[in-house]
Curated annotation (Swiss-Prot):
A Pfam family this chain is assigned to: GatC
Assembly behavior: Heterotrimer of A, B and C subunits.
Reactions catalysed according to its record: L-glutamyl-tRNA(Gln) + L-glutamine + ATP + H2O = L-glutaminyl-tRNA(Gln) + L-glutamate + ADP + phosphate + H(+); L-aspartyl-tRNA(Asn) + L-glutamine + ATP + H2O = L-asparaginyl-tRNA(Asn) + L-glutamate + ADP + phosphate + 2 H(+)
One GO term (biological process): translation
EC number(s) recorded for this UniProt protein: 6.3.5.-
Designated name of the protein: Aspartyl/glutamyl-tRNA(Asn/Gln) amidotransferase subunit C
Gene that specifies this protein: gatC
Length: 99
């Protein structure tokens, strides 16, 4: 899927970006290179290959050091709200800003 200069200018307009002609041409080359890489990756036959959550796990010398998913913090709402000038039902009371 190759983009044209018109496509790049239209995308820039939709994104509310102002691109000079030189910038648009440079962006066109970069985007087409990117889409070419994506097409190459899509052409690879991955039948029978399980997806990896962490590709680095396939390297034998490196072990993932993931911590246990445990609660390590406690709720300290009362301690944090103690110095507040006004609190009600666990919420901070502030002056009305918008009328």
């Amino acid at each position: 899927m190759a983009l044209t200069l018109t496509d790049v200018k239209r995308i820039a307009h939709l994104a509310r970006l102002e691109l000079a002609d030189a910038e648009a041409e440079h962006t066109l080359v970069q985007l087409n290179d990117f889409f070419g890489l994506v097409e190459q990756m899509q052409a690879v036959d991955t039948t029978g290959i399980a997806p990896l959550a962490h590709p680095i796990e396939q390297i034998e010398d490196v072990a993932l050091r993931l911590r246990d998913d445990t609660v390590t913090e406690t709720v300290e709402r009362e301690a944090f709200q103690r110095p507040a000038p006004a609190v009600q039902d666990g919420l901070y009371l502030v002056p009305k800003v918008i009328e």
